[in-house]
């Protein structure tokens, strides 16, 4: 992603909103801090208007979450894109539509179970390069690190050898 390396997952959405809230929280520590931030986000997050561009493909979303993945998991083991294969030379793009408060909770439950690809408002595709353009500036995360004002233009760099 423009000037910053990302090995696993980069994106924006409610997951980033939770991380931003955790970073701001001062009085509570550990898992409780994360859970409180998550609860706040579940009830206040409104989604991001974004455009996803990849080759000839152009689509707009009101995204609960939008990610470009090489790996399968974010955070403490949340399987954001179970179909992702780290050594296939492709970026897995996942976008989940934000469709109201009740649906946010439902989508989150699919996410926590690792079944987000089964969620009706989730979209997944493979590509070699993707741009995710929010209508307003927002914070993005790359491998869990937060960046403000970063242009999200991701591509696969070849060269890393994977041994299993």
Go through each PLM region and give its residues.
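Gly/Ser/Thr-rich active-site loops/lids in small-molecule metabolic enzymes
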Residues: 26-33, 76, 82-103
């Amino acid at each position: 992603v423009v000037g910053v390396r990302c090995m696993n997952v980069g994106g924006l959405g409610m997951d980033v909103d939770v991380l931003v809230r955790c970073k701001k929280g001062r009085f509570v520590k550990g898992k409780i801090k994360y859970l409180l931030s998550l609860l706040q986000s579940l009830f206040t997050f409104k989604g991001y208007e974004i455009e996803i561009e990849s080759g000839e493909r152009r689509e707009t979303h009101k995204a609960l979450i939008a990610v470009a993945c090489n790996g399968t998991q974010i955070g403490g083991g949340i399987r954001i894109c179970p179909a992702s294969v780290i050594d296939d030379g492709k970026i897995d793009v996942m976008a989940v539509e934000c469709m109201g408060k009740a649906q946010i909770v439902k989508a989150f439950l699919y996410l926590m179970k690792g079944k987000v690809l089964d969620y009706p408002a989730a979209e997944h595709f493979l590509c070699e390069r993707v741009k995710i353009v929010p209508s307003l500036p927002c914070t993005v995360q790359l491998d869990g690190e937060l960046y403000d004002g970063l242009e999200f233009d991701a591509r696969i760099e070849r060269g890393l050898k994977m041994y299993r």
